[in-house]
């Protein structure tokens, strides 16, 4: 099976990956790239040729890879992808305390945005997002790592005093999509797993995680302390749940 994955990966042009657009319509494309190319490259001269980072120091079941999205429309975006098979946000293992906190790893990987930009974006200029089951076309879990939209950043800042350790409803562009917002006053995600927080503490999420989208946006509070805004929204028959919409692939927020 492993050799089969390697063979499949060699015929898949990595550079065609564009967000949730599947390569050649293949919803397993990301999985084949990571398992068939990025992981085997480790320990060889080709290391980091395909993925900019692969961490399997704790084994494949707890590892992850970071892949540059090379779509022309996403010049600064990266994707964090587990090195084990996880389809997406609906997988109950993501809320299990024994599962790695992939959002923590994705936040640490924000440094790669700076590599592409030529300058590190400020803490509160970065956003992470995972789309709902119905609003993705790749069936391998991945977190988008990019800049937050400037208008989203502004609205979160303007409403900061209304947020707390309970979920608060807020409409965010584009265009006035309803999100539940949780204010996290910690400068690390080490002690907070967004999947657990949403599935266990957001009303209506438990048992329906496949309909959810989750985003994490860096926050710098009025007192200067860094933290996070955790955002979640639920898909319905009339509304998608595509947290990636909160991202600005052109990174205008950094003054480009």
Q: Model regions: which residues?
A:
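HIT superfamily nucleotide-processing domains
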Residues: 19-256
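Positively charged n-region of N-terminal signal peptides that target proteins for export
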Residues: 1-4
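Bacterial N-terminal signal peptides
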Residues: 6-17
């Amino acid at each position: 099976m492993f050799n089969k994955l390697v063979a499949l990966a060699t015929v898949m042009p990595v550079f065609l990956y564009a967000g949730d657009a599947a390569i050649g319509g293949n919803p397993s494309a990301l999985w084949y790239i990571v398992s068939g190319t990025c992981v085997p490259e480790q320990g060889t001269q080709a290391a980091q040729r395909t993925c900019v980072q692969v961490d399997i120091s704790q084994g494949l079941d707890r590892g992850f890879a970071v892949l540059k999205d090379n779509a022309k429309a996403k010049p600064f975006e990266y994707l964090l992808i587990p090195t084990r098979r996880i389809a997406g946000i609906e997988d109950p293992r993501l809320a299990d305390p024994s599962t790695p906190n992939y959002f923590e790893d994705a936040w640490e990987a924000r440094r790669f945005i700076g590599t592409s930009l030529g300058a590190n974006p400020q803490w509160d200029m970065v956003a992470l997002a995972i789309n709902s089951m119905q609003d993705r076309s790749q069936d391998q879990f991945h977190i988008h790592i990019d800049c937050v939209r400037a208008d989203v950043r502004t609205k979160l800042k303007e409403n900061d005093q209304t947020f707390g350790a309970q979920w608060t409803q807020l409409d965010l562009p584009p265009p006035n999509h309803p999100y539940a917002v949780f204010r996290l006053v910690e400068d690390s995600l080490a002690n907070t797993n967004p999947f657990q927080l949403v599935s266990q503490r957001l009303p209506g999420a438990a048992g329906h995680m496949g309909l959810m989208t989750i985003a994490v946006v860096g926050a710098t509070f009025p007192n200067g302390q860094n933290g996070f805004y955790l955002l979640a929204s639920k898909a319905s028959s009339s509304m998608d749940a595509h947290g990636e919409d909160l991202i600005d692939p052109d990174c205008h927020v950094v003054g480009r």
